Design a protein with these regions (language model features):
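Alpha-helical transmembrane bundle of multi-pass membrane proteins
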Residues: 1-241
Length: 241
């Protein structure tokens, strides 16, 4: 296919371009890679010992792996939107609860009681599980389902670049934000959880069992995107032999 990056800028591919940017962006501002990169530091901050912090990091990794496997089993039954929405709400609630516990219990010198420290660990595992069966795998699956062949290479390239770019940005800024916001960092990521869940609810159509060649119809029938892409079915018919 010739000039995929030029084609993806065309009006009829505007929804795919938006999703190629928005989905990986939201995937990273969930804060999941912060947990992956800095979990031992985070767990030591709330009062767990060094060994317990490392073990807790392994535990969150196992939870993420299991929940991703669960996603593989249920995604075709419940659909992409349902998992996006449920996972987003699960992450939002757990982040708010973690932030609330830390605001209430974390003193100026750091550390909380053992009971609350393990409560935070459980809540973070719930958060990781929410990501693992929703935004984790679906952040890669859905973009692969919405790009037609003529823009697939461009769309997937944009998706990967945006993902890695915001992985880098979030990872580089997290420690500074943690020092500045303290427990408020969880409310910060929770706020993005609200935004991305509303975005999916309003703007992402269901892609389950939709062939790639039929995706243009999905956009044309969507309440918002039909105003953006217009009706190019006539043009398609004129081009047909």
């Amino acid at each position: 296919m010739k000039h995929p990056f030029k084609k993806i800028l065309e009006r009829k591919y505007r929804p795919q371009l938006v999703m190629a940017i928005a989905i990986p962006f939201f995937q990273q501002v969930t804060g999941i890679n912060v947990i992956a990169f800095y979990a031992p530091i985070l767990f030591r901050t709330i009062g767990l010992g060094e060994s317990a912090s490392l073990l807790s990091s392994v535990m969150t990794g196992v939870v993420g792996t299991i929940s991703t496997f669960i996603s593989m089993l249920i995604v075709d039954k419940f659909g992409r939107r349902a998992l996006f929405l449920a996972g987003g709400i699960q992450m939002l609630v757990s982040q708010i609860m973690v932030g609330g516990v830390m605001v209430a219990q974390l003193g100026d010198h750091g550390g909380v009681s053992k009971g609350y420290a393990y409560l935070v660990l459980v809540l973070i595992c719930i958060y990781v599980a929410g990501f693992g069966w929703s935004w984790g795998p679906l952040g890669w699956l859905v973009p692969s389902e919405i790009f037609p062949l003529e823009i697939r290479s461009a769309g997937q390239s944009i998706n990967v670049v945006v993902n890695f770019l915001f992985t880098f940005i979030v990872a580089q800024t997290f420690l500074a934000m943690l020092c500045h916001f303290k427990a408020g960092i969880f409310f910060f990521f929770g706020g993005w959880g609200v935004v991305m869940t509303v975005f999916v609810y309003l703007f992402l159509p269901e892609t389950k069992n939709v062939p790639i060649e039929k995706m243009e119809i999905v956009w044309q029938e969507h309440w918002f995107w039909r105003r953006v892409v217009g009706d190019f079915s006539k043009d398609t018919k004129m081009e047909a032999p």
